[in-house]
Amino acid sequence: MATDGASCEPDLSRAPEDAAGAAAEAAKKEFDVDTLSKSELRMLLSVMEGELEARDLVIEALRARRKEVFIQERYGRFNLNDPFLALQRDYEAGAGDKEKKPVCTNPLSILEAVMAHCKKMQERMSAQLAAAESRQKKLEMEKLQLQALEQEHKKLAARLEEERGKNKQVVLMLVKECKQLSGKVIEEAQKLEDVMAKLEEEKKKTNELEEELSAEKRRSTEMEAQMEKQLSEFDTEREQLRAKLNREEAHTTDLKEEIDKMRKMIEQLKKGSDSKPSLSLPRKTKDRRLVSISVGTEGTVTRSVACQTDLVTESADHMKKLPLIMPVKSSTGSPLVSANAKGSVCTSATMARPGIDRQASYGDLIGASVPAFPPPSANKIEENGPSTGSTSDPTSSTPPLPSNAAPPTAQTPGIAPQNSQAPPMHSLHSPCANTSLHPGLNPRIQAARFRFQGNANDPDQNGNTTQSPPSRDVSPTSRDNLVAKQLARNTVTQALSRFTSPQAGAPSRPGAPPTGDVGTHPPVGRTSLKTHGVARVDRGNPPPIPPKKPGLSQTPSPPHPQLKVIIDSSRASNTGAKVDNKTVASTPSSLPQGNRVINEENLPKSSSPQLPPKPSIDLTVAPAGCAVSALATSQVGAWPAATPGLNQPACSDSSLVIPTTIAFCSSINPVSASSCRPGASDSLLVTASGWSPSLTPLLMSGGPAPLAGRPTLLQQAAAQGNVTLLSMLLNEEGLDINYSCEDGHSALYSAAKNGHTDCVRLLLSAEAQVNAADKNGFTPLCAAAAQGHFECVELLISYDANINHAADGGQTPLYLACKNGNKECIKLLLEAGTNRSVKTTDGWTPVHAAVDTGNVDSLKLLMYHRIPAHGNSFNEEESESSVFDLDGGEESPEGICKPVVPADLINHANREGWTAAHIAASKGFKNCLEILCRHGGLEPERRDKCNRTVHDVATDDCKHLLENLNALKIPLRISVGEIEPSNYGSDDLECENTICALNIRKQTSWDDFSKAVSQALTNHFQAISSDGWWSLEDVTCNNTTDSNIGLSARSIRSITLGNVPWSVGQSFAQSPWDFMRKNKAEHITVLLSGPQEGCLSSVTYASMIPLQMMQNYLRLVEQYHNVIFHGPEGSLQDYIVHQLALCLKHRQMAAGFSCEIVRAEVDAGFSKEQLLDLFISSACLIPVKQSPSKKKIIIILENLEKSSLSELLRDFLAPLENRSTESPCTFQKGNGLSECYYFHENCFLMGTIAKACLQGSDLLVQQHFRWVQLRWDGEPMQGLLQRFLRRKVVNKFKGQAPSPCDPVCKIVDWALSVWRQLNSCLARLGTPEALLGPKYFLSCPVVPGHAQVTVKWMSKLWNGVIAPRVQEAILSRASVKRQPGFGQTTAKRHPSQGQQAVVKAALSILLNKAVLHGCPLPRAELDQHTADFKGGSFPLSIVSSYNTCNKKKGESGAWRKVNTSPRRKSGRFSLPTWNKPDLSTEGMKNKTISQLNCNRNASLSKQKSLENDLSLTLNLDQRLSLGSDDEADLVKELQSMCSSKSESDISKIADSRDDLRMFDSSGNNPVLSATINNPRMPVSQKEVSPLSSHQTTECSNSKSKTELGVSRVKSFLPVPRSKVTQCSQNTKRSSSSSNTRQIEINNNSKEENWNLHKNGHLEKPNK
């Protein structure tokens, strides 16, 4: 290596690198680099790397010495002292490098030459090393590949040998198995034949068993019906006997009690006493059954104890009376709240439990079980007395009842309920709980009875209570005491009457009862607050007469006030609030709130709510030392826990001293509706206004509070709404009207909180402080807004109350109104301009409060209610416009106005970080959350302090709402492409149908979208092909991929998203949500594969014919080439044939053949020559000499029923069956020339016949064609209409299937049943030519909410299509055996009067049985449309009869020989109500006559055949007989249809509101006549529409209701007269049900006359 460098520079051979260069040269001569091994190359590389490192060191050292060498070289030999040397130096430096040579050798040049040489050698060495390494690697790889190939070659060779051996064995085994299988196939074929033979035998046996089973079921059904009828008769008889027994026992008991009373009276009269006036008159026990003594005491919390003692012996007539509520005085000296109610004995009812009857008699002693009461503090509540089966208060001293006495059961209200609801035990006819005494008694007797009824406990003058004996005690001493007490009470009554009576010194007000013998009457029935020192003044006068209106039940007021309970505005006004385990009933819904029923004697007895009478001061004189106790109760539920302070007492306990000289009357303004609360008190304070409301719980704290000075009195008057007292106090001088109690409640606050608008107005006009706050910072406006008193709110706002005042907790009036859902108050505050964004100390806003209660109206007002432009001058028009849609239903508010609240308020978070949306979502208030979501500024992703979003805390419903917040609803439609013109029967088929709407969310992926589309299609196909009304949700659990009609996701040809094509499984770069929005796709269209693709999926969906059947039809056409489709007219034959031809054409074209469709319509003038020309011109018939072409021809012959098949096709049958040149046929052309032709195999012939069955000579053609029969009672026609109409309904509802009870579903089901039952009846009549296919019913209109449109369409279809076809079919059948000389057409053109009668009868029967029956329209609406149907009036009046006695038995069914329609299935599609068990029919003798047999005895069926005894009279003005046997058969069939089990129950169709009068005739033959009084029906005066009849005629009164909610259609069918007896029995028996029928049987009548008399009314014959 060094040699190369040395040769270039021989002068450097003595350099220090010569040694290394010589070594390298020697090494190169010794070896070549290319031959080195890998290890040697590595070693050489390391040596060279070391050498390079050494050279680098040398270079660095030389660089270090470079400066020194340079200086030495340049200046070493010069001396600076010599200027000439310096000049020489400068000369050398200034000259060029090439001109001057250094004076001495330059070591730097040597170094640079060495460095350049080393670099070159290094580059060459590295290149050689890289090449060597690459070659080495390539070599090693090739060696490895070679080894691998060799191994694989060896393996393959070995495997090949193994496979050769195995193949030889397999071939040998296959040969053996082929031989064995060929033998087995022969054996299996033989076995199959045997099994098929056995199967046929089993089928025959099974059919026989099925027939026997059906007969057995029929017999069992009849027997079961008979048993049920007998059981019902036995039940009725037992109930009658039991009722009779009860009456007798009751009568016996009454007589015994009368005897006992008479004996007692005789004994009392014998003893002779001065106390006779205390004895009440003898009364029947029936006037007083239950005597209840209701006592209330007042403790720490006033409670009412009601104890009942029931003194009724066993009663047998199930008659109960309401308890007679008797006032009882207290047994202690403490104050009592006496339930001083008037006695109540209500009218009897029969629904009390029998267990109440068994009670012991106590000899009419009332006071025997009056409990002695403990001290007031021990009293507990017994609401409405002890419950059934329990005893009274365990602390009472009630003696135990005897063993034969039941505990008290009648629940008498201790506090009479204000909501006029009777106790549930009594089930009274009168809804009032406590009516007055028995209404049948004289008022004076009532007064006397009430006056002289003694109290159980009467306090003496000192307040001490003595236990007095009962009022009817036989002791003369007790009677004397009682008389003395009565006299004393009357004296006190007269003395105090001028203070207590409202009409003292004044003329009596209208409506007041007449005065009695005591002078003026004190109030009666008022629950009084008494002290032990005040005499009772409420005895001795008669109770008031009960009002006529149930809502104004004059019951005693509760002994403590009604509590203001904050309840939801949606709650009913008559619900009670539960207070201390005691139900306090609220005001009755019929009375305005605040108009209490007080002092029943002074109220006008009117049926409308009355305002309170003019008030008078009602003062009682209290002795010295007796304080007037105030009633104290606790207020429960009056304020939420979040707002302390509003439920505190209003004043402290204080004494009250009022002069006893105040007695005046003053008039006041009518009290507002919300200003009064029911209550009762006789205290001095509250009676000043003329009624007795007790003190509100606001003013009470704890126990009894004595009333104190004027400021407290002012507060109490304001709290109660006592306007008279309040105005009186306000007129006094020096009274502080702004005085507040210890809680800070002022009089204005109390009045505003309790909603006393008049008091508020008085106080405000007296300049009370409008913004005075209590200790919690609540102002009167806060209290009124919280309680919902909007009139007080409006009044306070008008007096400049601070609408934005915040309490200590930051609650503003708006916040409190929202918290309690008071919509009117919110509206008033918003209109006044209140601030919506004030926050509480907890960070809650009014929006939080409204959402927290779930009140949608409050939230809408907050978000959308705008402040009127003119400030407080807010008129009604602005009000209406600003409350835009609080009741607007589904309309979105953003379409009307935008929210007025900012996004900051909507998204404001409280102390916990929760926004209003958090609260709504967590509580499940979906409506509130939806309103919040409508605000564009809502941030649903905002997180609370626990890092939770709205979605995280939401309920499932709210999560669904949030997920669908921005979802796109894209309708999914199915398209079948273009449908051919309407002449193929496709005019009613729809091209596109909307099946559902897909919800596409932001997070929806393309896979989810594909699954959703596939699932929606599958669900839709299953829903429309199901048997019932399915919704899309109902079928999601069904995992089957194919529906009943054979369609699935595989039937899709293409899908377009808007206008962009897409396929299932395909994905785009954008998500489905972004893709739909960007492309503005308004719908997704699914196109089904159709005939153009050689498929029939679109045909299946358009026609609802199952895909399997369409494919089978196509296979028949391809296999047999000659196919004719036949069925009733309207069976879509033309459409099916054309679609099959299109599909076949495209299939042939796809196979490479040219194809053509030739269509010909056959009419009556279509001749055989025209058909020949058609065959020849279309190249179906080819001359024998001519070779066939490859072109395919499809010929369609439509309407073949219009010509004779045998005449038209007779000459073509043989060549069509054998298509070859070997069987030619000679045809003569029109020019007279004859030529041989044959049909080639590429010709397909299809025909259509609109006829249910072939007859006569046409049957000769049958064996030469493949026939496809489209039967109306078999698939595909059987379910086609149902599937089509269901799909139509789904499309009308935009993919949402309605519920089965929806009116649209009912009207569609009715249209479907009309088609099925119409065909069933026509098949039964033997008129197959009148059968209808479903095509006519495909146009059934589906208009939600307008069912009458469908009925009108049905009437047009009946008049235009059905009735003419039926008329023609009936006439043609009735004239089959007419004189041979005249043709059938003659009979049709000129029908006889008998034939006209039969036609009219048939039309009427069909209309009522098949069309009008089951129509879901109400009867009133249906009657309006009945006149539109032709033939519904059945105008026949017929008198003659015919008899078939001379007919042979077998002739009755002769007309059926031409009827090939299946009769077995005629009742298959009858509605469920048609298959009711026949209660009186023994059975039908044969299919021709279904004889009505009223005798349930089986021996009757063994008599002479009823066929010869049946007669039907169809009479016209003159006597005429039916002209032919077929007419007779038809008449019998019509009669049989009326009584058929398989058809609808015609008797059930008759509307019970018609006046049905049925008379018995004298003699053995009952005759039925009917008078139908219904002005809505089109019946002329001279005609009468005959009644419908089934096996049992339904006789009910005018109040009977339609069964099962289906309106019945009036029937116009004749009624057999053997059903008359039941009517008279049922009309005599009012208590029997309509299901219990007793039929009187006349075994002597063998004939049933169907009478349709000319006159509408028959005289009732004399019996």
From Swiss-Prot:
Q: Which InterPro entries match?
A: Ankyrin_rpt (IPR002110), Ankyrin_rpt-contain_sf (IPR036770), Cortactin-Actin_Reg (IPR050719), Cortactin-binding_p2_N (IPR019131)
Q: Which SUPFAM superfamilies does the protein's record reference? A: Ankyrin repeat
Sorted alphabetically, the Gene Ontology BP terms of this entry are: regulation of synapse organization
Which stretches of sequence are listed as region Disordered?
Answer: 1-23, 203-222, 367-440, 454-478, 498-614, 1448-1483, 1560-1663
Q: Where is the composition biased (Basic and acidic residues)?
A: 1645-1663
Q: Which Pfam families match?
A: AAA_lid_NAV1, Ank, Ank_2, CortBP2
Where is it found, in Gene Ontology cellular component terms? Answer: cell cortex; dendritic spine; FAR/SIN/STRIPAK complex; glutamatergic synapse
Coiled-coil residues are 119-276
Q: Keywords of this protein's UniProt record, alphabetized?
A: ANK repeat, Cell projection, Coiled coil, Cytoplasm, Methylation, Phosphoprotein, Repeat, Synapse
Which residue positions does Asymmetric dimethylarginine occur at?
A: R498
Which residue windows does the record flag with biased composition (Low complexity)? 386-396, 1624-1638
Q: Where are the ANK repeats?
A: 709-739, 743-772, 776-805, 809-838, 842-871, 912-942
Which residue ranges have biased composition labelled Polar residues? 583-593, 1561-1574, 1582-1599
What is this protein's function per UniProt?
Regulates the dendritic spine distribution of CTTN/cortactin in hippocampal neurons, and thus controls dendritic spinogenesis and dendritic spine maintenance. Associates with the striatin-interacting phosphatase and kinase (STRIPAK) core complex to regulate dendritic spine distribution of the STRIPAK complex in hippocampal neurons.
Q: What's this protein's name? A: Cortactin-binding protein 2
> What organism, scientifically named, is this protein from?
Gorilla gorilla gorilla (Western lowland gorilla)
Q: Which gene encodes it?
A: CTTNBP2
